[in-house]
């Protein structure tokens, strides 16, 4: 594998000294880029794009051609794992994901296979290998998965949800069924992420998009417990380097201390948290990723720069901060905004790393 030319993202995750704060954007390969829309049209549909290693590689690299990003993230979807379990995933035009066979009972959970990453999910590993080759060591490649809880919400609800009534009914009325599902998902995610690491991912991230809808104790019992299991099961060193792991719960500011206790290297922050407060609470144990509100990118360049400066000042001196948005970039942001954002992070962060 190629020698890494820019490793400040990996170093910051391990709280090692860097020359400036590294930055990437959640959903940086995506619909806000006209070239992404063209490639997706060429693929035919979203899952066809995910399954074509060359096209998945192309959209992964597109934002790196425009912006001085410090990491690439695999272009894929969190629902690849439940799809490989045979639930019949589809994406309707202009609609969110739908599962033809949602999980309703114990028998269905018992019959769910644990997917083999190098067979049912081989297309993801092929994409990782292709992207890693084409990156030529410019920046590291991030692999990722959804968290067991977040994957389970889609599998039980049958798609996206606002109220999460079906999965919460299962959680309170039949908790043993949900625990069995989450346990199987955790085992599947461990295999999946370890396969991504073996294929060339140099860091991994677990997206717990819906952990924040849970009550205080239920978050720990039904979400964090299974992310902890994943952290314990991951390959943490490959190609002679540590492979850092980041856990991100949207709405997880209440539980930063508990998340930091899992043994992860970094905790992702959404925009509702004051990064100075987060660093005071857990900065001695983990790196922090975040946490600008993605909607700031609608603002004028001066306002974007002001927000970047504020977050950098909030984190303060030294390494241990990966700058990012607090969630995925919106698809209709002005074309120049991401460049203003990325360049501002690099320019204004140097003073914090002297």
UniProtKB/Swiss-Prot annotation:
Superkingdom of the organism of origin: Bacteria
* Record-listed substrate binding positions: 27-31, 77, 154, 209, 327
A single Pfam family, by name? URO-D
**Annotated disulfide bonds:** none
Q: What class of enzyme is it?
A: lyase
InterPro entries according to UniProt? UROD/MetE-like_sf, Uroporphyrinogen_deCO2ase_HemE, Uroporphyrinogen_deCOase
What GO molecular function terms would the record report? Answer: uroporphyrinogen decarboxylase activity
Q: Name one GO biological process term.
A: protoporphyrinogen IX biosynthetic process from glutamate
Write down the EC number.
Answer: 4.1.1.37
Q: Is Lyase one of the keywords UniProt gives this record?
A: yes
Could you tell me what reaction this enzyme catalyses?
uroporphyrinogen III + 4 H(+) = coproporphyrinogen III + 4 CO2
Gene Ontology terms: cellular component: cytosol
The places in or outside the cell where this protein is found are: Cytoplasm
Question: Pathway listed for it?
Answer: Porphyrin-containing compound metabolism; protoporphyrin-IX biosynthesis; coproporphyrinogen-III from 5-aminolevulinate: step 4/4
Q: List site positions: Transition state stabilizer.
A: 77
Q: PANTHER family this protein is in?
A: METHYLTETRAHYDROFOLATE:HOMOCYSTEINE METHYLTRANSFERASE RELATED (PTHR21091), UROPORPHYRINOGEN DECARBOXYLASE (PTHR21091:SF169)
Q: Which family is this sequence assigned to?
A: Belongs to the uroporphyrinogen decarboxylase family.
Q: How does it assemble?
A: Homodimer.
Q: Main role?
A: Catalyzes the decarboxylation of four acetate groups of uroporphyrinogen-III to yield coproporphyrinogen-III.
Give the protein name, as stated in the record. Uroporphyrinogen decarboxylase
Q: What is the organism field in this record?
A: Actinobacillus pleuropneumoniae serotype 3 (strain JL03)
Q: Which gene encodes it?
A: hemE
């Amino acid at each position: 594998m190629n020698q890494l030319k820019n490793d400040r993202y990996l170093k910051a995750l391990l709280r090692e000294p860097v020359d400036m704060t590294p930055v990437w954007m959640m959903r940086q390969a995506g619909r806000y880029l006209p070239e992404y829309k063209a490639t997706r049209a060429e693929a035919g549909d979203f899952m066809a794009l995910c399954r074509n290693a060359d096209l998945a590689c192309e959209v992964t690299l597109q934002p790196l051609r425009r912006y001085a990003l410090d990491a690439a993230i695999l272009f894929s979807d969190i629902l690849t794992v439940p799809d490989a379990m045979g639930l019949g995933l589809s994406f309707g035009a202009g609609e969110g994901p739908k599962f033809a066979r949602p999980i309703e009972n114990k028998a269905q959970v018992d019959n769910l296979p644990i997917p083999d990453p190098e067979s049912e999910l081989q297309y993801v590993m092929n994409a990782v290998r292709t992207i890693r080759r084409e990156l030529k060591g410019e920046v590291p490649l991030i692999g990722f998965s959804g968290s067991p809880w977040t994957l389970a919400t889609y599998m039980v609800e049958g798609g996206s949800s606002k109220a999460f009534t079906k999965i919460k009914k299962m959680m309170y009325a039949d908790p043993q069924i949900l625990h069995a599902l989450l346990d199987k998902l955790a085992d599947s995610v461990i295999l999946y992420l370890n396969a991504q690491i073996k294929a060339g991912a140099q860091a991994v991230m677990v997206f717990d998009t819906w952990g924040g809808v849970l009550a205080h104790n239920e978050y720990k019992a039904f979400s964090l417990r299974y992310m902890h299991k994943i952290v314990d099961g991951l390959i943490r060193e490959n190609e002679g380097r540590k492979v850092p792991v980041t856990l991100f719960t949207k709405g997880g500011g209440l539980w930063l201390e508990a998340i930091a206790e899992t043994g992860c290297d970094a905790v992702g922050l959404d925009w509702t948290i004051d990064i100075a407060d987060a660093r005071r609470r857990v900065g001695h144990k983990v790196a922090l990723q975040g946490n600008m509100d993605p909607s700031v990118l609608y603002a004028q360049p001066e306002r974007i720069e002001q927000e970047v400066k504020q977050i950098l000042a909030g984190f303060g001196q030294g390494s241990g901060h990966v700058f990012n948005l607090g969630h995925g970039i919106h698809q209709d942001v002005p074309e120049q905004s991401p460049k203003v954002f990325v360049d501002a992070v690099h320019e204004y962060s140097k003073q914090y790393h002297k």
